[in-house]
Amino acid sequence: MAKPNYGIDNPRFGLIIVLAVVAGLAFGLGFRKSSIEAVRAAASIILSLVPTGIILILLMVSYVKVEKFRHRDRMLGMTPWRGDEQVLDVGTGRGLLMIGAAKRLTSGKSFGIDIWRERDLSDNTQEAAMRNAEIEGVRDKVELRNADAREMPFPDGTFDCVLSNLCLHNTPTQEGRAAACREIARVLKPGGVAIISDFTHTDEYAKAFREQGMETTSSVSFLVAPMLLRIVKASKS
């Protein structure tokens, strides 16, 4: 039976770590017996970094295989579910949050938007997200749109819940991130909730939501290997 595959986050970073570890080992082994002091010193420095690289690789594997699913469930557990909600996942990638929300719905629907850049996630495509939805048995409860978080193709007050994990920091400017938060506030229904997780800029997000009249009800940190993630929860009155 096929299993869903939610990819490797920031695959270029992982590749750099792997290559650095391999290069360090190769360099150290190749020049270990050299009499040239400069080479010995360089080999010593590189080899000293190998354990750190190995630890980072193990932490990344832990995140890909275990921790990001726990973090998804943590986020989804921060709001009660009736089953009829309209949900939006901003930066859905291969659909982790979108599908997780869809599995909590009965008559509701879960939407995902993204621009699907390969550098953000391995095999980061709409097709991969829909394949996961099919495998998870929620194909009829999800819908994907190719859209930027700063300009969403939805009317005001469309969603009961907006979710996002490790997405908004990819917007390169503070104004751009604030624009994304304004869009999240705009598409939320009165009484709706935004649950936004990231490793940076979360104070900006909370401030932007408050400027839209939203109440920031929680802002907490979680160590999710290999990152410290913060969750901002904001409610629209």
Enumerate the language-model features and the residues they cover:
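Core SAM-dependent methyltransferase catalytic element
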Residues: Q212-S237
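Conserved beta-strand signature within the Rossmann-like core of class I S-adenosyl-L-methionine
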Residues: G191-D198
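Helix-to-beta-strand junctions that scaffold the AdoMet/dcAdoMet cofactor pocket
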Residues: L105, T171-P172, L188-P190
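Class I SAM-dependent methyltransferase Rossmann-like catalytic core
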Residues: A2-V18, R40-A43, T52-L76
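A short acidic, Gly/Pro-enriched loop at the edge of an enzyme's catalytic core
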Residues: R82-E85, R150-V162
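Conserved SAM-binding loop of SAM-dependent methyltransferases across substrates and taxa
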Residues: R94-T106
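A short glycine-rich, Lys/Arg-flanked "PGG" loop and its adjoining helix->strand segment in the class I
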Residues: R177-P190
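Conserved class I S-adenosyl-L-methionine
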Residues: G83-G93, F111
